[in-house]
Amino acid sequence: KHAEHRMLMGSLLTFKRLKQNEEYLHGLSEMLIDRFIDKGSCDIVPEFAHATTVYAISDLMGIPMEDRAILLEQIGAPPSQVQGDAPLKVGPDPLVAMKPLFDAYLHDRLANPRGDLMSELVHARFKDGTSPDFDTLSNLARFLFGAGQDTTSRLIAMGVLVLGERPDLQERLRAEPDRIPDFIEETLRYDGPVKVAYRLATRDTAIGDLAIAAGTILTVCYAAAS
């Protein structure tokens, strides 16, 4: 199912659609900066980085403006915590809390398509021509909204930190704005938001001369590769 769902989602996020979102992003950045510029300071993560990611995907998906602040608060809540008592308990999952709202959006798009990502999602088809059931649509819509939120906001925040510590880079990028994509790429490589990933070996294997037994938990350090 993962491959089917990935193919379905990939068909929605086309280069043309993302390009059309650029003008909105420019206006969004100015709007967010206007909110704190007169103060002379801000908490860059919630006030700019996190807000940028939430509002950007909200615009692509066609989420009403009046609901975006609610979703920003929900997705920005502290991560779920595992309690130390038994039986095992975890904190609230923001994607679960969002389900009623997203279900309402999807029902509306089924009846009234609007040309946004959610409208395309509810009318999307798998490769064999079948349609996702409603629960699958709900899960995919919330996944689309939440995917990349944390990593993107961290990348934005790290980029701001680097520029704050390197006035020379600020001046260079102002003089050579065509180098901004290179700066973003290098920030992602040098101090990316995802440091490690974990994998479970399902069978005996080897990496080079290192034997790895089935059941071994592996830690993949992306920073080491950079």
Predicted region positions:
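Cytochrome P450
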Residues: K1-S226
